[in-house]
Amino acid sequence: MKSFDLGEHLNDIYAAFPEANRQPVIGITANYTNGDAALRDKYYEQVARAGGTPVIIPPIADKNAIINTLEHIDGLLLTGGADINPLWAGEEPSPQLHSINATRDEAELLTARLAHNRQIPMLGICRGIQTIAVALGGKVCQDINSASPTLSDGTTVMSRIKHSQDADRQEPTHSVNIKPGTTLSKLYGERAFVNSFHHQAVAKTGPRFNVSATSPDGIIEAMESNEYKSIIGVQWHPEWLGDDGLPLFSWLVERANEFREAKELHERILTLDTHCDTPMFFPQGVRFDQRDPRVLYDLHKMTEGRHDAVIMAAYLPQPQLGEQFSQKVDIAGIIRHNPQLQGLSTQLSPTQYADLIFDKLEQIVDENSDYISIARTPADLYEDKRKNRKSIMFGIENGLALNHDLANVRHFAQRGVVYITLCHNGDNDICDSNRGSAMHNGVSEFGAKVIQKMNDEGIMVDLSHASEKSFYDALDISRTPIVCSHSNSRALCDVPRNLTDDQMRALAAKGGVAHTTFYHGFLRKDTSEATIMDVVSHLEHAIDIMGIDHVGVGTDFDGDGTVRGCADASELINFTLQLLRQRYSERDIAKIWGGNWLRVMAKVQSSKKQS
């Protein structure tokens, strides 16, 4: 018999510690009717059965309410309900359109898009799959009974099957064919029997999703992310199917639990990306405080990806013989978008150009000083994290910036530059490039002095882009460990830009690090698209050759580095998720995400000669 003694129930809770098991929090969108925000019990019961903690999300189209809600959930369940107003998809209403739910539309479309930005696992059910599609570039058929029944291969079938059953909600009434190799096929095999209560369906999934199941008459019954994200949408109602529906909820809870683990890990460790080229976009007037689609790094994306710090490089393209440096860069574009620079000459030296980039970065930081800071040392990075600020460090990509003047090494050290990539795509006065003509047969006499001066000033020597001979020369010349801020494995992708296994071993033997990059041409030599799994493969090969203490991540974002599954800074937590799936420990993930690099940085900076 049920007890009504509150103390008895509390005693059961207080009898052991912890009082409850940790569970991922699953936000569930509520329906809205006549002033009531409500939810059918089947949704939250299935979430609870799967091991999640369900919370109901009311349909409030307020950015503060939505974003703060998303910050506190680990997974999102978008529920069924009325039609979505077709105006949200840029369409006029069909005569067959049923009732809409305007209160839900804006709130849920915003929630879905913002959850996607934050990599939150999602399950969409019925209206929910349509919400995901509309929010992320897909299309919904306003009335499937008015459309010709066509299979995915273009074959027209004789008639539409019944998609709005009269049978009990718990009764499956038609089959769905599930595509092999999908997440759904791992849950249900190649065929499942489902219930059906809809007159609309996803017509086009959009570029971020693949169809994973169809009905016998060709209706899209399920879709899932093709970006290695934990997102599935189904047209049927698994919440009513008891044990048969439970696998989808278990999948959501498992993925939410994994995401919670990754979020908590990012709270505890420092994450540092050692190379991006976002300053290349300054001539286009990009804003770091806006979520700008033109760049892969900004404050929004860093926050969404729960990422702490990045080394932004002042990239200097290497002029060919007869070219002037000022012809290679859009100085006029930077001036155009920065009125305070009006009157500045467009005929800048490489040193002046690098200084201009760092001036602009300092301006960005000054304008957003509550949220971001310039860091010069590992201690600065940890202090910024403690104060909940993002960090930018300065790097130089191409020693051309020194303008053949050793005094500029100290100048850039004083500006806070933490590394200089000795060359880029072409030989310079310091060393030969892997895309050069062996002008010096390795490091030049001047280059040897540059390396020694960098050692004296506590600047890391970066050998990404250097020729193999330059690499070994620099390794012999430098008194401090060498880094490769964004370099991959030649054993997996045989291009001169990548490191051989012998180079990796030599680098590790001298205490250096090589950071895996996301540039597709250094991940795969064939024409197929590079993905986050290729990045993991290159990282793991580097670990096999050098050991866990000599690897890291240098994305090359905004320098053409991007892959499906980790396309910009908002998706960097997805890389952590992949490491967790590969069973890397927290300690090893911390090393990969910058711990190894910071060890080398500390050693290099501590070796600085006192003047």
Where are these regions (language model features)?
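Histidine-centered catalytic micro-motifs
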Residues: 194-201, 233-238, 271-278, 466, ...
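Divalent metal-binding pocket/active-site signature
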Residues: 400-403, 411-497
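Redox-cofactor binding/interface segments in oxidoreductases and associated redox assembly factors
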Residues: 28, 77-78, 312, 422, ...
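N-terminal hydrophobic targeting/anchoring segments and the immediately downstream early-domain regions
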Residues: 261-439, 494-553, 557-611
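N-terminal beta1-alpha1 cap of cysteine-dependent amidohydrolase-like domains
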Residues: 1-125, 134-135, 141, 145-187, ...
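Beta-strand-turn-beta hairpins that frame and shape the catalytic cleft
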Residues: 208, 226-231, 384-389
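A short helix->loop->beta-strand "cap" motif at the edges of active sites that frequently abuts
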Residues: 118-120, 390, 459, 480, ...
